[in-house]
């Protein structure tokens, strides 16, 4: 397990509020150490000043205990203060990322966030300086592990780094709130190729990735969850790129990759929307998404550009990072040696989505040698293995995702349909 981590995304390694909770607990411990130091010092004075007491008490050890408690008080106090400062710096990074995103859709809200940033900077000038340092350090390490090992790096290295640098551009790699797709997608047709009634929903990250379409040629699986109170919700499982061609009947191709990455409507996106509609999803319905590779971009734009309400999206190896809203849980799985994931530019400097959102990161194959394949770290199986590691962790955000699985389990019926889509080629 090389470099395995679960964090809130980018420079944000923990939730600022959680960090403040820790700081307050450390401060409470400091207070108790201070009380203990004062009590020990008082006891030492009393014993020393009282004739005959020193014969029965080791005053040297007592003084050392008091001195140790005093030093521990100072260390705890300093740690609490520095932890609170770090929490402010992390929040500052998040506020800046949110303000930059909202500038496109809600200038007033962006102004309010920048005003909050100004207040934090005025209260403690160290906050913006530390925030800038955090982002700088994140930028330096975000592509760590991406360079393939020798001798593959002689062939693929330049391609991988070109992809990473393209993703680092402010124009690409990030889907901001309110983002829409330009142009018109190629015409597609869809057809159901398999139906089933699963007995239970997925109960874990790995379990959700294992529910990708399995019928021959299927690219989208839609599960409809119906509840006793009449509610319905949908979960879409969308595969990644299926061919390296730049056109043809397969919508999940490099043409769709290029279109989605540059913000244009693609045949694969249109096919996904059509599949959801065919499964019964209507505007305003909750549609949650589990995706791999190219489908991560489809999921991102479903959350910002479609008429569906996307509350949870799980993306493995996505070329883009979505800046989800406060009410949206965004879960990303990224391998630092995955050149496709590198197109996201290393993710976002601030956290994405709701506080319970998280990013799982690791180097998929740190021991790769002569048998290295540039897309090995991008494979779905490798990401399922990463998801299993996350499921086995005790990270509270992974545990909170359990509420999503629990809600799905309350459905009375589950109807699953897998769809195959084809691009309609223009007649000559």
Give the label of every model feature segment:
Residues 23, 269, 295-296:
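Short, hydrophobic/amphipathic alpha-helical packing segments
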Residues 29-43, 47, 167-185, 289-291:
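Short secondary-structure boundary segments
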Residues 1, 294, 337:
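Single, functionally critical "micro-switch" positions that shape active/binding sites
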Residues 290-300:
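Gly/Ala-rich beta-loop-alpha elbow adjacent to hydrolase catalytic centers
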Residues 1-114, 120, 428:
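N-terminal secretion-targeting helices of virulence/extracellular proteins
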Residues 61, 118-285, 307-428:
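Alpha/beta hydrolase fold serine-hydrolase catalytic domain that processes acyl esters and thioesters
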């Amino acid at each position: 397990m090389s470099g395995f981590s679960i964090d809130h995304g980018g420079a944000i390694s923990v939730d600022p509020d959680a960090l403040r909770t820790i700081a307050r607990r450390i401060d409470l411990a400091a207070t108790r150490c201070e009380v203990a130091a004062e009590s020990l010092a008082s006891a030492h004075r009393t014993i020393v000043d009282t004739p005959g007491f020193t014969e029965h008490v080791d005053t040297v050890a007592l003084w050392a205990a008091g001195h140790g408690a005093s030093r521990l008080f100072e260390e705890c106090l300093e740690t609490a203060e520095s932890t609170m400062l770090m929490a402010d710096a992390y929040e500052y990074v998040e506020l800046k990322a949110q303000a930059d995103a909202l500038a496109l859709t809600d200038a007033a809200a962006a102004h309010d966030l920048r005003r909050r940033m100004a207040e934090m900077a005025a209260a403690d000038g160290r906050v913006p300086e530390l925030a800038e340092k955090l982002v700088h350090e994140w930028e330096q390490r975000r592509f760590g592990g991406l360079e393939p090992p020798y001798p593959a790096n002689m062939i693929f290295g330049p391609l991988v780094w070109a992809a990473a640098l393209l993703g680092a551009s402010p124009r690409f790699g990030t889907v901001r709130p309110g983002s829409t797709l330009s142009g018109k997608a190629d015409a597609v047709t869809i057809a159901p190729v398999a139906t089933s009634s699963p007995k239970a929903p997925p109960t874990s990250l790995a379990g959700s990735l294992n529910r990708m379409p399995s019928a021959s040629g299927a690219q989208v699986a839609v599960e409809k969850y119906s509840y006793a109170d009449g509610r319905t919700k949908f979960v879409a499982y969308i595969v990644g790129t299926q061919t390296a061609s730049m056109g043809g009947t397969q919508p999940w191709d490099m043409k769709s990759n290029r279109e989605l990455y540059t913000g244009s409507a693609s045949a694969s996106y249109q096919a996904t929307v059509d599949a959801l509609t065919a499964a019964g999803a209507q505007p305003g319905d909750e549609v949650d998404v589990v995706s791999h590779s190219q489908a991560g971009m489809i999921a991102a734009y479903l959350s910002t550009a479609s008429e569906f309400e996307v509350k949870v999206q799980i993306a493995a190896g996505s070329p883009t990072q979505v800046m989800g809203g406060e009410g949206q849980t965004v879960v990303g799985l990224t391998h630092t040696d995955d050149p496709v994931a590198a197109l996201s530019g290393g993710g976002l400097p601030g956290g994405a989505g709701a506080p319970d959102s998280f990013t799982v990161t690791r180097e998929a194959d740190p021991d790769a040698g002569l048998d290295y394949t540039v897309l090995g770290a991008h494979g779905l199986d490798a990401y399922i293995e990463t998801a299993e590691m996350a499921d086995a962790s005790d990270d509270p955000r992974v545990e909170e995702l359990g509420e999503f699985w629990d809600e799905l389990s309350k459905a009375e019926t589950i109807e699953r349909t897998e769809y195959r889509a084809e691009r309609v080629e223009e007649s000559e």
